[in-house]
UniProtKB/Swiss-Prot annotation:
List of catalytic residues: D64
Subcellular location: Cytoplasm
The protein's name: Uracil-DNA glycosylase
Any GO BP annotation: base-excision repair, AP site formation via deaminated base removal
Gene: ung
Top EC category: hydrolase
Record-linked InterPro entries: UDG_fam1, Ura-DNA_Glyclase_AS, Uracil-DNA_glycosylase-like, Uracil-DNA_glycosylase-like_sf
GO cellular component labels: cytoplasm
Reported function: Excises uracil residues from the DNA which can arise as a result of misincorporation of dUMP residues by DNA polymerase or due to deamination of cytosine.
Pfam family, one: UDG
Length: 227
């Protein structure tokens, strides 16, 4: 049987739950009070818009969005074109240079082309106050993203989960290892990348798994949108 569950179905189900209504209300109240919240309201659910549930091939978990101006746009680790590449993504590019033959470090951090190929770039908290890292951690987003991971676990087969750092690894503890391929490494941040993120070869391992299971490999070279 073909599973036709979509993110629209999952989100509609969550929106009926009191915790999620409360989460959305708290974020709306922050914006209404004049606080700057990232990403902009229209971008909060971009990961779901760009990577449909039925097309998820790889999941990369982040934590909360970048909290500087013009950075966050709803995809974990990604920044808008024209913004300096953040340190963790610089380290991801360094790893890609050594892991993927022919990869050349791009001069931008815009990862939408990954998302369109089936790489779910999911932050575990989807909003943040400007300049205040982890400021929305208690808003209920973690419950929502637990349920998102559970939906991928249940409705997809053979997804590669790249879990970097203790937070992502704890978050991914519910994943069925018999149905999905789970890879662990330290976080790519400058604080921990040298403890085993560099040399982990997760990007090539993900592609090998996908091709061995009848899926197309990911082109990890991020593309800017055509002008």
């Amino acid at each position: 049987m073909v599973n036709t569950m979509t993110w629209h179905d999952v989100l509609a189900e969550e929106k009926e739950k009191p915790y999620f209504r409360n989460t959305l209300a708290r974020v709306a109240a922050e914006r209404a009070a004049g606080k700057t919240v990232y990403p902009p309201q229209t971008d909060v659910f971009n990961a779901f818009r760009l990577t449909e549930l039925g097309g998820v091939k790889v999941v990369i978990l982040g934590q909360d969005p970048y909290h500087g101006p013009n950075q966050a746009h709803g995809l974990a680790f990604s920044v808008l074109p024209g913004v300096p590449v953040p340190p963790s993504l610089v380290n991801m590019y360094k790893e890609l240079v050594t892991d993927i033959p022919g990869f050349e470090r791009p001069n931008h951090g815009f990862l939408e082309s990954w998302a369109r190929q089936g790489v779910m770039l999911l932050n575990t908290v989807l909003t943040v106050e400007a300049g205040q890292a982890h400021s929305h951690v208690k808003f209920g987003w973690e419950t929502f993203t637990d349920n998102v991971i559970a939906a991928i676990n249940q409705h997809r087969e053979g997804v590669v989960f790249l879990l970097w750092g203790a937070h992502a690894q704890k978050k991914g503890s519910i994943i069925d290892r018999k149905r999905h391929h789970v890879l662990h490494a330290p976080h790519p941040s400058p604080l921990s990348a040298h403890r085993g993120f560099f040399g982990s070869a997760h990007f090539s391992q993900a592609n090998r798994w996908l091709t061995e299971h009848g899926e197309s490999a990911i082109d990890w070279m991020p593309q800017l949108p055509a002008r």
